């Protein structure tokens, strides 16, 4: 993952999975081509928050639990690092419905 602000990531796990591959590829392409990102510099605090978020998300991706549990865990991780997340009711049930459709 590139140096992004945590609040730029999606607030739910299915959306995170959908954009993360694109995000990884875009950052790698920038590195290979030497292109500077349009994202402003992170403060020291934002960089540390991103690093901790990145560590926890990597652990989550390796975790051997069902999809519904990963949805819940991701939401907990996201709320831990993004403080102004509005409470959404029914998001976890949406994860279950998506899992059942697969």
UniProtKB/Swiss-Prot annotation:
Pfam families reported in the protein's UniProt record: Curto_V2
Domain of life where this protein originates: Viruses
InterPro entries: Curto_V2 (IPR009931)
The protein's role, per its UniProt record: May be involved in the regulation of ssDNA versus dsDNA levels.
Protein name per its UniProtKB record: Protein V2
């Amino acid at each position: 993952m590139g140096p992004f602000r945590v609040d730029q990531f999606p607030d739910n796990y299915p959306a995170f999975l959908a954009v993360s591959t694109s995000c990884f590829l875009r950052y790698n392409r920038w590195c290979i081509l030497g292109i500077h990102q349009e994202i402003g510099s992170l403060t020291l605090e934002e960089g540390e928050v991103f690093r901790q978020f990145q560590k926890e998300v990597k652990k989550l991706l390796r975790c051997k639990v069902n999809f519904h549990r990963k949805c819940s865990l991701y939401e907990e991780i996201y709320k831990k690092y993004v403080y102004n997340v509005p409470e959404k009711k029914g998001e976890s049930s949406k994860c279950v419905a998506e899992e059942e459709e697969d």
